């Protein structure tokens, strides 16, 4: 669900799709997916598409402008996520570690910062592995120092996009309040307008916490929610998390400005691949045990 769905078509259909820009919704499962990859059986021709709710057709997803500075999407799903960010207000990027969802989100956010956004707000639940509470008080240091460990994934992504000088640029943007790091538990009472708000590791939130954060986002803003439903550090079950409740709600599915996509291709080490395979095996085992107990 939410993955880039593959549809095999004839070469002439690919050619026509590029000419006309739309195609009949042949085998697309538009109830579970929004993005599609049309490809020939030999894999030599392909095109990305998105489902148009109003026409019921698949429309061509143009990828030429989907890049920023040192960033360019590495696969079809990353291209679809970047496109979704440019064309929607609420976007959920799903995927395991190494799929590039944070890098794609930040590339879009930095692009918007240079265009018309007032600032970028970076959030993340402050949860250690195995802990159930979100709190930063126990960590030594001032507010900025406390956040550095939690926000490291953002720094890593910025370095990929900006290069070695990212620390200098980041310092300037922070001084001007154009990039703001916010502890997740301090979002209550905040209100963000004309901003790009990114919430990473959303699988570690409760439904109440995530919905509270969503309610803080105001006019002319984009909210990007990132997470991996299968890697939860907060002690919650997958179905109890805010991320899971959000993407499986009827309201989200029917919302005209909300979309979700799952990234699956990993660009990390073989060790990271192994960890993900083990996580998936354990999840499948737990689901089988739960089914047998019902």
Where do the PLM segments sit?
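Conserved helicase motor core of SF1/SF2 NTP-dependent helicases
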Residues: 1-5, 13-16, 67-71, 75-196, ...
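Walker B catalytic carboxylates
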Residues: 200
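Interdomain "pre-motor" coupling segment immediately N-terminal to P-loop NTPase/helicase cores
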Residues: 1-61
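Short glycine/proline-rich turn/loop motifs
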Residues: 62-66
């Amino acid at each position: 669900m939410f993955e880039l769905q593959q549809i095999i078509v004839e070469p002439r259909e690919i050619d026509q799709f590029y000419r006309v820009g739309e195609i009949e919704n042949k085998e697309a499962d538009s109830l579970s997916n929004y993005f599609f990859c049309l490809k020939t059986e030999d894999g030599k021709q392909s095109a990305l598409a998105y489902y148009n709710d109003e026409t019921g057709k698949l429309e061509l997803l143009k990828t030429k402008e989907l890049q920023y500075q040192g960033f360019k999407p590495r696969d079809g799903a990353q291209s679809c996520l970047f496109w979704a960010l440019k064309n929607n207000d609420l976007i959920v990027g799903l995927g395991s570690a190494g799929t590039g969802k944070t890098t794609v989100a930040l590339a879009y956010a930095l692009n918007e910062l240079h265009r018309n956004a007032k600032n970028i707000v970076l959030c993340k639940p402050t949860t250690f592995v195995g802990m159930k509470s979100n709190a930063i008080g126990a960590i030594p240091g001032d507010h900025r120092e406390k956040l550095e460990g939690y926000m490291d994934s953002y720094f890593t992504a910025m370095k990929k996009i900006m290069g070695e000088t990212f620390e200098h640029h980041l310092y300037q943007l922070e001084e001007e309040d154009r990039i703001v790091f916010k502890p997740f538990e301090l979002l209550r009472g905040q209100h963000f307008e004309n901003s790009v708000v990114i919430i990473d590791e959303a699988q570690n939130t409760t439904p109440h916490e995530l919905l509270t954060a969503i309610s803080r986002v105001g006019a002319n803003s984009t909210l990007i929610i990132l997470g991996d439903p299968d890697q939860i550090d907060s002690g919650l079950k997958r179905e109890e998390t805010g991320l899971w409740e959000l993407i499986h709600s009827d309201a989200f599915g029917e919302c005209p400005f909300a979309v979700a996509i799952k990234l699956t291709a990993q660009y990390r080490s073989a060790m990271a691949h192994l960890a993900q395979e083990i996580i998936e095996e354990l999840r499948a085992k737990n689901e089988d045990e739960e089914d047998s107990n019902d």
